[in-house]
Curated annotation (Swiss-Prot):
It comes from Enterobacter sp. (strain 638). Binds 2 manganese ions per subunit. Its cofactor is Mn(2+). One of its GO terms (molecular function) is manganese ion binding. The gene is pepA. Gene3D superfamilies: Leucine Aminopeptidase, subunit E, domain 1 (3.40.220.10), Zn peptidases (3.40.630.10). This is Probable cytosol aminopeptidase.
Length: 503
């Protein structure tokens, strides 16, 4: 699908369809008012007859409106004007895209980017429209033998901006929006792949392909079990012992800043391509969704794709920690004591608290890069889902400025995170009689004690932890990966690269 921006008046558009907003109760947006004036009150007469109230998501498709060059006008309800916030704006865009696609409008000029969204500029509105449009049109049908496609799909979308001065920022918004949307799609595709296809080897092959596609800036190295053993990554290796699939750690290095002083930002993604729970096996119900336990790695992969696509002038390293947690004759057990790469020992009380055992070794491994900051992304705890539900990602950090930066980026991107504490009081719950620490700390504050566990391996750099257990995928009828937090991390890196969207 093609996107572009222009600045023009609605009556001069020769497009197949013009999209304008209507507020409650039956109030025309400024652009809709212009069209109403040209058509001698045709639109307002329809509203007076009760054809459209203007409630969020309501639509009315008009054909051959008098004195208007465009074949169709799509009126879309935007709710009350003062209540049009970021969430509602995105819902209106989503409804617009779905309606255009369903009604066979192959091209459209959208004036919704001229609506006032509190505290948001044209760049934000255009970029969010692009990302939302791509999200609305996403489908995962690679493994279906029959694919359903609309007869006349939407192919071209033009966003109108209020002044010619804003064309440049609109074009940049499209460029950024497309790159982020492609990263989200890549993350969703990886997440939705079944575990018999998407194992650690598959993740590694995707990482290598990324380096092939962006060979100018990206180098990928894949570290296998033998090398991990030599590095002393015994905790990571223990988790994969029960699986026939080899554990593989894929390290994707992107260099956008040639300066020797430029330290990299490191992103670490938990890549449990299937988590049965191991010997502490999970219940059968919903176990199929444990293919999504690699959504952290999928998100990191998506972000690395975005960074390479936009050629950001920063250095970023993405680590996909690929592994599979299965029961078997070689599987690690409750009661085992593991020696981590850092030298610290861990008593395993539950083999289903495996993500932290993989991440702790990777967090030690990345010390060699002397990072500016390290952010790990993981579907880590069910406790985070209890604390924050399925709408907001959990954030913990040992560095206040980094935490504030990430929270700010999450608000900018509309991919929200909320900070949880990392107090020393919680560390007591991880005490063990037989090792330096236990791998679980009981039910109270489970998301926080998991963060506290990881914090013991991140003392040499600024670090943040994103627990995406509640936000990485949806269950039920709309089951599928969400691609979060690609948008959040993309915004964070855009800000670091000097593209914060404040035109």
């Amino acid at each position: 699908m093609e996107f572009s921006v222009k600045s023009g008046s609605p009556e001069k558009q020769r497009s197949a369809c013009i999209v304008v907003g209507v507020f409650e109760p039956r109030r025309l947006s400024p652009i809709a008012e212009q069209l109403d004036k040209i058509s001698d009150g045709y639109i307002s007469a329809l509203l007076r007859r009760g054809e459209l109230e203007g409630k969020p998501g309501q639509t009315l498709l008009l054909h051959h409106v008098p004195n208007v060059l465009s074949e169709r006008i799509l009126l879309i309800g935007c709710g009350k004007e003062r209540e049009l916030d970021e969430r509602q704006y995105k819902q209106v865009i989503q409804k617009t895209i779905n309606t255009l696609n369903d009604t066979g409008s192959m091209e459209a000029v959208c004036f919704l980017t001229e609506l006032h969204v509190k505290g948001r500029n044209t760049y934000w509105k255009v970029r969010q429209a692009v990302e939302t449009a791509k999200e609305s049109l996403y489908s995962f049908d690679q493994l279906k033998t029959t694919k359903s496609e609309p007869r006349r799909p939407l192919r071209k979308m033009v966003f109108n901006v209020p002044t010619r001065r804003e064309l440049t920022s609109g074009e940049r918004a499209i460029q950024h929006g497309l790159a982020i949307a492609a990263g989200i799609k890549a993350a969703k595709d990886l997440g939705n792949m079944p575990p018999n296809i998407c194992n650690a080897g598959y993740l590694a092959s995707q990482a290598r392909q990324l380096a092939d596609s962006y060979s100018k800036n990206i180098v990928t190295r894949v570290i296998g079990e033998q090398q991990m053993k030599e590095l002393g990554m015994h905790s990571y290796l223990a988790v994969g012992n029960g699986s026939q699939n080899e554990s593989l750690m894929s390290v994707i290095e992107y260099k956008g800043n040639p300066s020797e002083d430029a330290r990299p930002i490191v992103l670490v993604g938990k890549g449990l391509t299937f988590d049965s729970g191991g010997i502490s096996i999970k219940p059968a119900e919903g176990m199929d969704e444990m293919k999504y336990d690699m959504c952290g790695a999928a998100a990191v992969y998506g972000v690395m794709r975005m960074v390479a696509e936009l050629q950001l002038p920063i250095n970023v390293i993405g680590v996909l920690a690929g592994c599979e947690n299965m029961p078997g004759g070689r599987a690690y057990r409750p009661g085992d004591v593991l020696t981590t790469m850092s030298g610290q020992t861990v008593e395993v009380l539950n083999t289903d608290a495996e993500g932290r055992l993989v991440l702790c070794d990777v967090l030690t491994y990345v010390e060699r890069f002397e990072p500016e900051a390290v952010i790990d992304v993981a579907t880590l705890t069910g406790a985070c889902v209890i604390a924050l539900g399925h709408h907001i990602t959990g954030l913990m950090s040992n560095h206040n400025p980094l935490a504030h930066e990430l929270i700010g980026a999450s608000e900018q991107a509309g991919d929200r995170a909320w900070r949880l504490p990392l107090g020393d009081e919680y560390q007591e719950q991880l005490e063990s009689n037989f090792a330096d620490m236990a791998n679980i700390g009981g039910r109270p504050g489970g998301a926080i004690t998991a963060g506290c566990f990881l914090a013991r391996f991140t003392r040499k750099y600024n670090w943040a932890h994103l627990d995406i257990a509640g936000t990485a995928w949806r269950s039920g009828k709309a089951k599928g990966a969400t691609g979060r937090p690609v948008a959040l991390l993309s915004q964070f890196l855009l800000n670091r690269a000097g593209f914060n969207g404040e035109e």
